[in-house]
Amino acid sequence: MVGFKNRYMLMEVFLDPDKDLLGEGTPIILTQFNLSKAIKDSILVNFGECGLGSSLGSFQVKYVNPITKLCIVRSSREEHRQVWLAITLVKSIGNCPVILNLLDISGCIRACRDTALKCDKEKFEQCSKSLSEEEIRQMNTSLEKIKLLEN
């Protein structure tokens, strides 16, 4: 039996709270749902319903860290370039303008997880002095969650 081939994309999300489209001062909170919806909308706009249907087979946002803004997206090996292009063309999540930067593409979740863990730890060390107790607790929870990431 042949296993299903996936690609895992590690991305960094840059939020721009100063240029909020509605003029409100609060930036959006990054969640798996928000990111997934933005990418699916981009696939629909750029590739149509057929492109969206072919991409949804294994598309999933596996991990999102709302503090460091790192996320892991899974897609099928056949459609990963289409998903990658759609990710590049995402301009906003909700009403907040964003830029998505691809950091790594991997064929297995373990390699992507290790890279994400390394990036998360580096970013956490850089900004740990300016974080509140709640944010530090949330960051530690996110680090534990990524260590358990397998499927």
From Swiss-Prot:
One biological process term in Gene Ontology: tRNA 5'-leader removal
Protein name, entry field: Probable ribonuclease P/MRP protein subunit POP5
Top-level division of the source organism's lineage: Eukaryota
Effect of deleting the gene: Defective embryo arrested at the globular stage.
Keyword tRNA processing: yes
Gene Ontology MF terms in the entry: ribonuclease P activity; ribonuclease P RNA binding
Subunit structure and binding partners: Component of nuclear RNase P and RNase MRP ribonucleoproteins. Interacts with GAF1/RPP30.
Family classification: Belongs to the eukaryotic/archaeal RNase P protein component 2 family.
Subcellular location, record wording: Nucleus, Nucleolus
Entries under Gene3D superfamilies matching the protein: Ribonuclease P, Pop5 subunit
Record-linked InterPro entries: Pop5/Rpp14/Rnp2-like, RNase_P/MRP_POP5, Rnp2-like_sf
One GO CC term on file: plant-type vacuole
Zinc listed as a keyword: no
Pfam assignment, any one: RNase_P_Rpp14
Keyword annotations of the record: Nucleus, tRNA processing
Function per UniProt: Essential protein required during embryogenesis. Component of ribonuclease P, a protein complex that generates mature tRNA molecules by cleaving their 5'-ends. Also a component of RNase MRP.
